[in-house]
């Protein structure tokens, strides 16, 4: 990582040539192929094959940029609307590799900023934070006092030009924005970035990493209003927000928008001492200690702010307010289902004969076994009743490859749900995948499951399903509003949609 940091240091006087010196360097393509900076094996996408040749990507981008300089536009030959080609190459095939390279290039400045902010600081790793389900349990001390939660569906997907302009503002490179805008307009699947459903938007499984980056970058602008309100209002003493990125010129822009559009006059209505915000996969959850009237004020304030400042139309009915005492807090898709339950602790004095009852609220993290079995059924690991089936499409692979694919699927699921106290559902998933793996191997060798396991031993499968892997933790340090000390928020598995198709069960 130090080598990358040293090689990627950019001179401010050369920022107008931001993309072009980087895009032809070999390690950029290596990073694009590995899908990230210093990713561990658990975050890798095993779906790559020999088609993703780094040399092909490099030659194609050089050819495209040469054509752009010579003719000032891209050449299209539209034989068919579904078979468009860019300078003779298939769009669907080569655009994936082009955008993978662009994604790494645009993420470099933010990765360097993260490294520079962490330089000289020791990162404290909590060993008990081993899954996303443990995140809610860790926040029980802060969010247990919250009474209401507002579930807001993200606004409609941004236009390609607006997303490119937002990235250009941070990169400060006009040439980079022009080249990126050309590729965005040439790509036809931008509208499939988010799939609209009845009450929310969800990311498509075929999304490109660059589009996810640009979308999160754009959404972060209007959701960062919570950070501004925390600093402006003395009533908002505590805020917890997990965002993808922070804008450089955020405070200047938001301050201008709030005070020129007469939003300051209504800041006094927000008197909640606790405010927690989290967003995942097109859904946002805002939890606060207060009444439903307070959450309704937040609801209409956010809608008005989005419409006036970002010119985004969002109807109030897309924001639902639930009481945490009656509803489960499920904001991470299949990752976790958190329920707030009351807990009574009784204490008895030693000398005096009376009891003291203390009421507490605690989080119970649940494993959504029914949606998970449905996802396994769609992936042909079993039927809708949870009975294992053999994966015939993998029967032609070698024995180690078959066991590795089944074990990788289980480790991905277990990584999220290991924070739950009730792991019986995980044992059921492990049973389905192990028996499905055994049936696939038995079909490959034209044998029965009993005979195959008797010949090789049950311990062989157990070894693959219990192997531990290193998990990459991405830590963002932020200044505390009270003491000035640094506190850190963890983000798990930002690329879950890219690596695990079982995540999109809904």
From Swiss-Prot:
Q: Which family does it belong to?
A: Belongs to the intron maturase 2 family. MatK subfamily.
* Keyword terms, alphabetized: Chloroplast, mRNA processing, Plastid, RNA-binding, tRNA processing
**Name of a matching Pfam family:** Intron_maturas2
Biological source species? Arctostaphylos uva-ursi
**Could you tell me what this protein does?**
Usually encoded in the trnK tRNA gene intron. Probably assists in splicing its own and other chloroplast group II introns.
Keyword Transcription included in the entry's annotation: no
One GO BP: RNA splicing
Protein encoded by which gene: matK
Q: Name one GO cellular component term.
A: chloroplast
> Membrane-spanning regions, if any?
none
Any signal peptide, and if so, which residues?
none
| Keyword Chloroplast annotated | yes
Instruction: Tell me the protein's name.
Output: Maturase K
Provide a Gene Ontology MF annotation, just one: RNA binding
Its domain of life?
Eukaryota
The subcellular localization recorded is: Plastid, Chloroplast
């Amino acid at each position: 990582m130090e080598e990358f940091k040293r090689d990627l240091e950019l001179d401010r006087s050369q920022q107008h040539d931001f993309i072009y010196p980087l895009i032809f360097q070999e390690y950029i393509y290596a990073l694009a192929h590995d899908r990230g900076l210093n990713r561990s094996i658990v975050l890798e996408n095993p779906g790559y094959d020999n088609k993703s040749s780094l040399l092909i990507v490099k030659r194609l981008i050089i050819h495209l940029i040469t054509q752009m300089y010579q003719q000032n536009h891209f050449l299209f030959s539209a034989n068919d609307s579904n078979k468009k080609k860019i300078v003779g190459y298939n769009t669907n095939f080569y655009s994936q590799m082009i955008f993978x390279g662009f994604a790494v290039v645009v993420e470099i400045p933010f990765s360097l900023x993260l490294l520079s902010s962490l330089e000289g600081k020791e990162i404290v790793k909590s060993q008990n934070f081993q899954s996303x389900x443990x995140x809610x349990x860790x926040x029980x001390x802060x969010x247990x006092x919250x009474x209401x939660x507002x579930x807001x569906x993200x606004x409609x997907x941004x236009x390609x030009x607006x997303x490119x302009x937002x990235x250009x503002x941070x990169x400060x490179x006009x040439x980079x924005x022009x080249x990126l805008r050309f590729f965005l307009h040439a790509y036809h699947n931008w509208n499939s970035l988010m799939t609209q459903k009845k009450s929310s938007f969800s990311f498509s499984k075929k999304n490109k990493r660059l589009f996810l980056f640009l979308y999160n970058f754009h959404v972060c602008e209007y959701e960062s209003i919570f950070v501004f309100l925390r600093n402006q209002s003395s009533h908002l003493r505590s805020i917890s927000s997990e965002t993808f990125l922070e804008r450089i010129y955020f405070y200047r822009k938001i301050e201008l928008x709030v005070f020129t559009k007469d939003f300051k006059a209504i800041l006094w209505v927000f008197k909640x001492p606790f405010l927690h915000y989290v967003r995942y996969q097109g859904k946002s959850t805002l939890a606060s200690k207060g009444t439903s009237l307070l959450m309704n004020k937040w609801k209409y304030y956010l809608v008005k702010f989005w419409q006036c400042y970002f010119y985004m139309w969002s109807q109030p009915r897309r924001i639902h307010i639930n009481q945490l005492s009656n509803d489960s807090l499920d904001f991470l898709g299949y990752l976790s289902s958190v329920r707030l339950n009351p807990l009574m602790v009784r204490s008895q004095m030693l000398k005096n004969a009376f009891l003291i009852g203390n009421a507490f609220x605690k989080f119970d993290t649940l494993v959504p076994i029914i949606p998970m079995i449905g996802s396994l059924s769609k992936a042909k690991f079993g039927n809708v009743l949870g009975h294992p089936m053999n994966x015939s499409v993998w029967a032609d692979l070698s024995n180690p490859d078959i066991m590795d694919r089944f074990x990788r699927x289980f480790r991905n699921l277990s990584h999220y749900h290991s924070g739950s106290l009730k792991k019986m559902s995980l044992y059921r998933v492990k049973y389905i995948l192990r028996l499905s793996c055994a049936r696939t191997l038995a079909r490959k060798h034209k044998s029965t499951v009993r005979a195959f396991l008797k010949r090789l031993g049950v311990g062989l499968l157990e070894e693959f399903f219990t192997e531990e892997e290193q998990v990459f933790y991405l830590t963002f340090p932020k200044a505390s509003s009270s003491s000035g000390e640094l506190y850190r928020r963890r983000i798990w598995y930002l690329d879950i949609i890219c690596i695990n198709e079982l995540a999109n069960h809904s």
